Curated annotation (Swiss-Prot):
This is Protein RnfH. SUPFAM superfamilies: MoaD/ThiS (SSF54285). InterPro entries: Mopterin_synth/thiamin_S_b, RnfH, RnfH_sf. It comes from Buchnera aphidicola subsp. Acyrthosiphon pisum (strain Tuc7). Belongs to the UPF0125 (RnfH) family. Coiled coil: none annotated. HAMAP family: UPF0125_RnfH (MF_00460).
Length: 99
């Protein structure tokens, strides 16, 4: 059985989890995440709530991984990007009136 190396990453604002995993060829994204033990390191990661990707391209948990893949676990958004821009524009207009 051939062994491949992949990296599983999950980033929070103040800490990053980066785990190198040696796993059998033909394994899935889910297998690599389970092998990385990230689910036990932080309560923020869940198969049901987080999107998963390889090199910034969303994939399913059953996706077969290749040697050298970087499996990324994405955080959920805390604010809608449109709402953030709207608030940012509103604040910048308000500041212009003050100065």
């Amino acid at each position: 059985m051939k062994i491949i190396k992949v990296t599983v990453v999950y980033a929070l604002p103040k800490i990053q989890y980066i785990c190198q995993v040696d796993i059998a060829l033909g394994s899935t994204v889910k297998d690599a995440i389970l092998e990385s033990n990230l689910l036990n390191l932080t309560n923020d990661v869940s198969f049901h709530h987080n999107r998963i990707g390889i090199y910034n391209k969303t994939v399913h948990l059953k996706f077969k991984i290749k040697d050298g893949d970087r499996i990324e676990i994405y955080r959920n958004l805390t604010i809608d990007p449109k709402e953030w821009r709207r608030n940012n524009v509103f604040l910048s207009k308000k500041l212009k009136k003050i100065y």
